[in-house]
A protein has these predicted regions:
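Flexible glycan-contacting loops in extracellular carbohydrate-active proteins
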Residues: 174
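Feature responds to low-complexity, polar/acidic, surface-exposed segments characteristic
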Residues: 2-46, 54, 59-107, 114-171, ...
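Short, T/G/N/S-enriched strand-turn elements that build extracellular solenoid repeat scaffolds
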Residues: 213-294
Length: 294
């Protein structure tokens, strides 16, 4: 298992004073799910897809089609992860011969490889246009969230009839996603080898992230669930985050200040490089993160 970049697991009250890390703005798309004629507001996915569109994560296949039940490609998922975390640093991906520079997704694949969420299907193939399987999707999300795979090593998957269909390389990630209650499976089981739909992926992200901060300013209201900050010049002051606090890769050139903030879940920093984290009460090591996006 690779070294984790989680700065602190705060399981009790941790009052952080003046945390300064870098940040940069992330783009969003001002659209509504109801703009798409194939969006069903009564469907099981309605809330999750609406949130994904509202937060600029999920784009339409055209100006009128969102294709919620369509299979998500590996390139599309890379793009959504990058948008979510505000990634901006790319790496050379010339070894992947099937990722042409002329393709819309070339930069997104390069960003995803740099972030560490994506590996090729072989040393020379990324298969960007291929549908992404459910176990691949769980792996990518688990990597992005830096889940502690060892902590979930004993997660019981026996309730899923198709447990044995999970590939050995994906098993730690699947256990972590199920153990963290981020994925619940389909009616017939986890179906790890099936392709994930666009709506299903939106639902997974909706299960994980309760809100996004994309506008500069000061926030002093308690935050329900987990929050992902993906812009700069944000101050959280005198508030409690009920879930995880995630500072995305976009934390690069500006600053984020946490003044008397209580985090009941995990504190994960992708951006901000190796800047120190100063806390009045600290429940885990809060040294430099060494994140590739910082």
């Amino acid at each position: 298992m690779k070294k984790k970049r989680i700065l602190a697991m705060i399981l009790a009250v941790a009052s952080c004073l003046s945390l300064a890390v870098s940040a940069s703005a992330a783009n969003t798309v001002a659209r509504k799910a109801t703009d798409f004629r194939d969006f069903d507001k009564s469907a099981w996915y309605a809330e999750a897809v609406s949130a994904a569109v509202d937060n600029g994560l999920l784009y339409g296949k055209s100006s009128t089609i969102i294709d919620p039940n369509g299979a998500m490609t590996r390139a599309e998922m890379a793009a959504i992860i990058n948008r979510s975390f505000g990634c901006y640093k790319a790496v050379d991906i010339s070894q992947y011969k099937d990722v042409a520079k002329s393709k819309w997704y070339y930069k997104d694949v390069a960003l995803a490889v740099q972030m560490g969420t994506y590996n090729g299907r072989s040393n020379s193939s990324m298969a960007p246009d291929s549908p992404i399987t459910r176990q691949e999707a769980m792996t990518v999300v688990a990597r992005a969230l830096e889940l502690d795979y060892d902590a979930y090593a004993k997660t019981d998957l026996s309730k899923f009839a198709d447990e044995k269909n999970i590939s050995s390389w994906a098993l730690p990630y699947v256990r972590a996603m199920v153990g963290a209650d981020y994925i619940h499976g389909r009616t017939k089981g986890l179906e790890p080898l099936d392709n994930i739909t666009r709506a299903e992926f939106a639902q997974i992200f909706h299960n994980i992230i309760g809100s996004y901060i994309t506008v500069k300013g000061t926030y002093d209201k308690d935050i329900k669930g987990s929050v992902l900050i993906r812009t700069d010049d944000v101050e959280l002051k005198n508030l409690t985050v009920d879930g995880d606090l995630i500072i995305g890769c976009g934390a690069a050139d500006g600053k984020i200040v946490l003044d008397n903030v209580t985090v009941k879940g995990r504190f994960l920093v992708w951006g901000g490089g190796t800047k120190a984290v100063y806390c009045k009460q600290r429940h885990a090591n809060a040294g430099g993160c060494g994140c590739p996006c910082g």
